[in-house]
Amino acid sequence: MTVMRGLLNGGRYGNRYIWTAISLRHPEVMEGNGLESAVMQWRRMLSNAGGAEAQVKEQKEEKKDAMVSNYWGISRPKITREDGSEWPWNCFMPWETYRSDLSIDLKKHHVPRTFMDKFAYRTVKILRVPTDIFFQRRYGCRAMMLETVAAVPGMVGGMLLHLKSLRKLEQSGGWIKALLEEAENERMHLMTMVELVQPKWYERLLVLAVQGVFFNSFFVLYVLSPKLAHRIVGYLEEEAIHSYTEYLKDIDSGAIKNIPAPAIAIDYWRLPKDATLKDVITVVRADEAHHRDVNHFASDVQVQGKELRDAPAPVGYH
């Protein structure tokens, strides 16, 4: 009766009182009263479940991260820099970093002689006009838009060569990897520029529009004429070199402040810890010169009636 009164009173006496009352009973009485035992077990289960849920919630709030299942055995190994400090990036690993070849010739130019070359050259010059009008000398925003476009051709070319390799059951000569490396490198340029520029909402909207139009246009172009597509990209890279050279002139003149380099750029290009914006733009420009050479070379190979797999791919630069 003491136990029943405790339950009816809504636990007014608390669990301690109830358990004390039960402990005073004769063992035979406890064994014979299955209802009381069931009620107590039920209350204990509710209490334990609530505590476990609270603990999990607490852990989630402390970590401020989604709970990840260990069932699949996927985990990030501990990765460190050369100095032993923890590697902070998930988007690229230490073995994917490199030092740009700053000795590359920035003045190389493919002189347009054939109709295809002239068409590619004029197309790029026409595309530059609205860019000059919209961005003028805001080279940070200009570079962001440029890298949004420049990261597309490598991905499109690599994807189509990948499908061709599967379809024809033949090797690509390393060109799939080379073009995808180019696309990833251009994407890292963009990620760096976003750290520097912090684009406004209308610039982000412009990026969406440009990417949608350019990706589909370049996809169709590459299907119809890969050699023309690579020639256009070669001339686009020449324009990129010019834009970054003007960017550096404004930094040298003081028109643009030579701020410290973003951490992501220091790690990706293996720059010194005291690197500045000028150092970042210098290595990015060197990358663009390399992409210029690769795409003009790819176009030359196909102009000669050969396939890309017949020529060695420049794999491993980045």
UniProtKB/Swiss-Prot annotation:
UniProt: Fe cation 2 binding residues: E186, E237, E288, H291
Catalysed conversion reaction: 2 a ubiquinol + O2 = 2 a ubiquinone + 2 H2O
Principal location listed in the UniProt entry: mitochondrion
Gene Ontology molecular function: alternative oxidase activity; metal ion binding; superoxide-generating NADPH oxidase activity; ubiquinol:oxygen oxidoreductase activity
Cofactor requirement: Fe cation
Keywords: Disulfide bond, Electron transport, Iron, Membrane, Metal-binding, Mitochondrion, Mitochondrion inner membrane, Oxidoreductase, Respiratory chain, Transit peptide, Transmembrane, Transmembrane helix, Transport
Gene3D superfamilies to which the protein is assigned, alphabetical: Alternative oxidase
GO cellular component: mitochondrial inner membrane
CDD domains linked to this entry: AOX
UniProt binding sites for Fe cation 1: E147, E186, H189, E288
Source organism superkingdom: Eukaryota
Induction text: Increases during ripening.
Localization (cell): Mitochondrion inner membrane
Transit peptide residues according to the UniProt entry: 1-46
Function as written in the Swiss-Prot or TrEMBL entry: Catalyzes the cyanide-resistant oxidation of ubiquinol and the reduction of molecular oxygen to water, but does not translocate protons and consequently is not linked to oxidative phosphorylation. May increase respiration when the cytochrome respiratory pathway is restricted, or in response to low temperatures.
Annotated family: Belongs to the alternative oxidase family.
Subunit structure: Homodimer; disulfide-linked.
Protein name from the UniProt record: Ubiquinol oxidase, mitochondrial
Organism: Mangifera indica
